[in-house]
Design a protein with these regions (language model features):
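ATP-dependent carboxylate-amine ligase
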Residues: 1-142
């Protein structure tokens, strides 16, 4: 199952609430973190302090099997996940959101969460369509 989850980038409370919601859901989960404020990508802010007010620790769970950090903030997300105690082997990186799809294991039975920012909605829907294609192809191959 693919779940779209808008996580307002640069807003610690909004992201924390989404992470807590994901934690509360039963079953194994794979996450694609692409919560990037694309509107300021050309004049990118050097202030990622909101990430340190965000409860990434909610994602430090045995139920979360893979976290793929994608987009211009991929390395910032990786660092924050490591500081939250999430094992490095669960974290994968891709600067391109479509390339990030190749890093998801897509284990049968796992729910896949796409977490995206407000102005990244059109991109998130295009990524979701590619993900659906990958899932259908994987189903057909089995």
């Amino acid at each position: 199952k693919v779940i779209m989850q808008m996580s307002k980038d640069k807003n610690a409370l909004a992201c924390s609430r989404n992470f807590d919601y994901i934690r509360s859901k039963p079953g194994k989960k794979e996450l694609l973190l692409m919560m990037n404020c694309l509107g300021v990508a050309k004049s990118w802010s050097e202030n990622p302090s909101w990430m340190y007010d965000t409860d990434f620790e909610f994602l430090n769970s045995d139920d979360v099997t893979c976290l793929v950090c994608a987009g211009p903030r991929a390395y910032d997300y990786q660092l924050r996940l490591l500081l939250a105690g999430i094992p490095r082997q669960k974290i994968r990186l891709a600067e391109d959101e479509f390339a990030a799809l190749e890093l998801l294991p897509l284990t049968p039975g796992d729910d896949v969460y796409l977490l995206y920012g407000v102005d990244g909605t059109p991109l998130a829907f295009r990524v979701r369509e590619k993900l659906k294609e990958k899932l259908l192809a994987k189903e057909g191959a089995q």
